[in-house]
Amino acid sequence: MYNMMETELKPPAPQPNTGGTGNTNSSGNNQKNSPDRIKRPMNAFMVWSRGQRRKMAQENPKMHNSEISKRLGAEWKLLSESEKRPFIDEAKRLRALHMKEHPDYKYRPRRKTKTLMKKDKYTLPGGLLAPGGNGMGAGVGVGAGLGAGVNQRMDSYAHMNGWTNGGYGMMQEQLGYPQHPSLNAHNTAQMQPMHRYDMSALQYNSMTNSQTYMNGSPTYSMSYSQQSTPGMTLGSMGSVVKSESSSSPPVVTSSSHSRAGQCQTGDLRDMISMYLPGAEVQDQSAQSRLHMSQHYQSAPVPGTTINGTIPLSHM
C-alpha cells in the first residue's frame, strides 16, 4: 500500500525510495519494476502522508517504517475535515487522471497464501491424549489390554504430580516381590470372603489417591492390594502404585517404632471394621495386614532396626 507514497504518478526521473524500502519483499520489487504493472491511484491519506513520512524518516532515521505508519495514522485521525479537504481534492484529481489514462484498469488484489491453523501447529505429544477421547478418562479407567498405555500415562502423571519416574519404577519393582512365606497359607482362607464386593469400584481411584496423599498412610492401600485377586484391572493396579509411592518410609528410631505400630494397628482396625462382616475375623486380618505393610515398608532406611521392621512384641 505504501509503495506509491514516495513516488509521483509519473516521476520525471528515477529517484531513490528512502521511506518505503522496509515494507517490500522480493516479489513486490519484481512486480514494482515490471512495466506492465499499473499502480492504484493514491487516496487522501497517501497524498498527505507522502511528505510527512519523508520528514519523519529524516528526523528519526532509526525508526522502523511500521512505527512511522502508526504515528502517521494517529495524526491523520486527529486532523479536522477542513484540514483534510485539500488532500481529498487532490486524491479525486489523481483518480480521475488515472481513469483517463487507464480506462480498462481493474483492481485485482493479490491472493494471500493460507496459513496453518493454531490447532494444527501446536499439537500435544502423541502419548498424552488418546485419539478422539479424553486423556484423563482413558488413563484412569483402562482395561487389562492397555498395559503400555497405562505405563506411559503414569509417567506423564508422575511429572504432573511432581514425582520423578524413578519412584514409580521402584514401587513397580516392589509389587513383583513374592509375599511373605508365613502368610501364604493364612491368606488363602481369607482370600474369597474379602472380595465379595465388586472390584470395579476401584475405578474412582483419582479421588481416593488424593485422600491417600493427604493422609500419608499407605498401609491400608498396600495390604488391600496384596489380598486382591490376580484378575485385578490395570487401572486399580496403577492407583495402588501411585498411592504407595506417595509416602516414603519414615526415618524414626527404634523407640518410636512401637508407638507407630500401635497407631497403625488402631487405624487398621477402624478401616477393617468398615469392610469385614464379622468381628471374629478382625484380629486375624489386622495381624496379616500389618505383616504385609511391614514387609513392603522393610526397605533399609538409615537409623532403623534390621530391615526396618517393627517389633511385634506389643501385639
Swiss-Prot record:
Polar residues bias: start-end ranges? 304-315
Q: Which GO terms describe its molecular function?
A: chromatin binding; DNA-binding transcription activator activity, RNA polymerase II-specific; RNA polymerase II cis-regulatory region sequence-specific DNA binding; sequence-specific DNA binding
Cross-referenced Gene3D superfamilies: High mobility group box domain (1.10.30.10)
Which UniProt key words apply to this protein? Activator, Cytoplasm, Developmental protein, DNA-binding, Nucleus, Transcription, Transcription regulation
Annotated Gene Ontology cellular component terms: cytoplasm; nucleus; transcription regulator complex
User: Could you tell me where this protein is found in the cell?
Assistant: Nucleus; Cytoplasm
DNA-binding stretch(es), residue numbering of this chain:
38-106
> InterPro entries under this entry?
HMG_box_dom, HMG_box_dom_sf, SOX_fam, SRY-related_HMG-box_TF-like
Motif span (9aaTAD)? 270-278
**Which SUPFAM superfamilies does the record cross-reference, listed alphabetically?**
HMG-box
The free-text tissue note of the record is: At the shield stage, expressed uniformly in the future ectoderm. At the 75-80% epiboly stage, becomes localized to the presumptive neuroectoderm; strong expression in the presumptive forebrain, weak expression in the presumptive spinal cord. At the tail bud to 3-somite stage, expressed in distinct regions of the future brain, the anterior margin of the neural plate and the future retina. At the 12-somite stage, strong expression in the central nervous system rostral to the hindbrain, including the optic vesicle.
Domain of life the protein comes from:
Eukaryota
Q: Where is the composition biased (Low complexity)?
A: 236-258
Q: What is its main location?
A: nucleus
Q: What does this protein do?
A: Transcriptional activator. May function as a switch in neuronal development. Downstream SRRT target that mediates the promotion of neural stem cell self-renewal.
Q: What is this protein called?
A: Transcription factor Sox-2
Q: What is the lineage of its organism?
A: Eukaryota, Metazoa, Chordata, Craniata, Vertebrata
Gene, per the UniProt record: sox2
